[in-house]
Structure formats: C-alpha cells, structure tokens
Amino acid sequence: MSGFGDRLAGATARRGPLCLGIDPHPELLRAWGLGTDAAGLAGFSDICVAAFAGFAVVKPQVAFFEAYGSAGYAVLERTIAALRESGVLVLADAKRGDIGSTMAAYASAWAGDSPLAADAVTASPYLGFGSLQPLLDTAREHDRGVFVLAATSNPEGASVQCAVAPGAIPGRTVAQAIVDAAAEVNAGAARGSVGVVVGATLSAPPDVSALNGPVLVPGVGAQGGRPEALAGLGGARRGQLLPAVSREVLRAGPDVAALRAAAERMRDAVAYLGENP
C-alpha cells in the first residue's frame, strides 16, 4: 500500500479537495426524522455513506458515535468499513492525545489493525508533540495518516495556541511549533503523511509552507469559513489544503440525492484549491 500522503493526493486530484463530515448531532437526527438512538445513528450513517460514495475524504466525528456506547462504536466500525469499501478515504475525527502506553493503545485502536482504524486520524499534541510518537510510529507502519491539531477556530484555543513558549524562537507561537514539528516528521518524503489542522476562520494562521503535508481546514460553510477565501491559507501551496464541511452539507438531508447535490456544490466551490483544477 502506498503512503497516506500519496493516496490523499491521488484521491483529491481525481475527486476534488473536499472532506465531508458525518456529524450525527441529535438535532440533525431529529431534523431527518430519525430517532436519537443507535438505530437513528445507523440510519443517518447509512444515508451519508450512500450520498458520499465517490468523494475523496469523509470524516466521521467520533464523539457523536461514542455517545451511544458500544452500539455507537458498532455503527462507527460498520460506517468506516462501508466508506472504505466504496473507495473513500476515511479520516476518524477522534482527537486522541495521551502519553506512553496509553497513547500506544490509542494508536493501536485508531491506526493499527483495529476495526476502528481508518485511513487517518486526528490527534491532539497538547501534552507535547513528542507524546504523539507512538501514534506516528503506528500510523507509519500501517501506511495511515495523522492530522495534528495546530490552530483551531474556537476562541478558547488562542490562549494556548497563540502563546509563545519560554526560550522559543522570538515570535514563534505554540501552533507554529506544532506545524514545524510535523514538518520535521515529513522531511524527506515525497508527500508527507502527517498533516495539521488549521481553522478556516483564523485571521493569522501559522505558516504551513514548509510542512510538506496536508492541511485539514474545518469550519467551512455554516461555521463561517468562506470557500472562496481559502487560497494560500498560511502560505499553503495548491493541492495542500483540504477544506472540511459538515453542517452546510448535512442540513440538505435526509434525501440522498439532495445530500449528494449539496456535497457536489461545495466540491465545485473549492475545486480551485486542487493541483489540477
């Protein structure tokens, strides 16, 4: 199997640079006429799988599945498998982060041979970037990707992410240090498999020009990020940004055709970001 960075580049070149979210929020379940239980969760997920087949990347939000306990995890496992069988790259939005053996256990679950393992997973570096090493190692061994939270759009994040660590290069924020650490992991690869997460609505994003890896850009659409305003975010090159959209598309459901049409409109809106628009 080729590395995740290569698989992602191929998928977005063929199918467009867009990541579609599966976020089964209780309000959406009710809006779709589904129950706020495991059966409703399964119905919601099945509709999304049918609508999003043929797109490049789909991102299930793990927390909404966890809320239903073991039944929710069973639905998540089935959803990941169905998406991958349809040729879609799956990014598990789990945001895991810990140290030592606990991080290694998370790595086995989300980047090893577990039924939960997707093509890539999100991770939190705020116990120190080095704490992610077990995950980075496991992902590399299994040709999977990792997207590390760097600069998020929520206002609470700035107090940590925009801070300058004592002894750091003058002006280099914590978020920039995370991007730079990811770049070191990607060094020497044709296409790195360690990406970062940078919010679409940030006025001063970190510099990702030397990352040599993908940049997941959540917050497009309903959360305020404008598809037409993403070019060059953080110095990104063409083909590097992967905009992520959830609510803007999901509110078009539950009809599969309507949901797919909404996803296609968003894909068209961000097509200019690809390497071969």
Swiss-Prot record:
Q: Which domain of life is it from?
A: Bacteria
Specify the pathway. Pyrimidine metabolism; UMP biosynthesis via de novo pathway; UMP from orotate: step 2/2
What are the recorded GO MF terms, alphabetically?
Answer: orotidine-5'-phosphate decarboxylase activity
Q: Provide the alphabetized UniProt keywords.
A: Decarboxylase, Lyase, Pyrimidine biosynthesis
Q: Which residues form the active site?
A: 95 (proton donor)
What Gene3D superfamilies does the database record attribute to this sequence? Aldolase class I (3.20.20.70)
Query: EC?
Result: 4.1.1.23
Xref: InterPro entries? Aldolase_TIM (IPR013785), OMPdecase_AS (IPR018089), OMPdecase_type-2 (IPR011995), OMPdeCOase_dom (IPR001754), RibuloseP-bd_barrel (IPR011060)
Entry's Gene Ontology BP terms: 'de novo' pyrimidine nucleobase biosynthetic process; 'de novo' UMP biosynthetic process
Q: Report the sequence similarity comment from the record.
A: Belongs to the OMP decarboxylase family. Type 2 subfamily.
According to UniProt, the name of this protein is Orotidine 5'-phosphate decarboxylase
**Provenance organism:** Mycolicibacterium vanbaalenii (strain DSM 7251 / JCM 13017 / BCRC 16820 / KCTC 9966 / NRRL B-24157 / PYR-1) (Mycobacterium vanbaalenii)
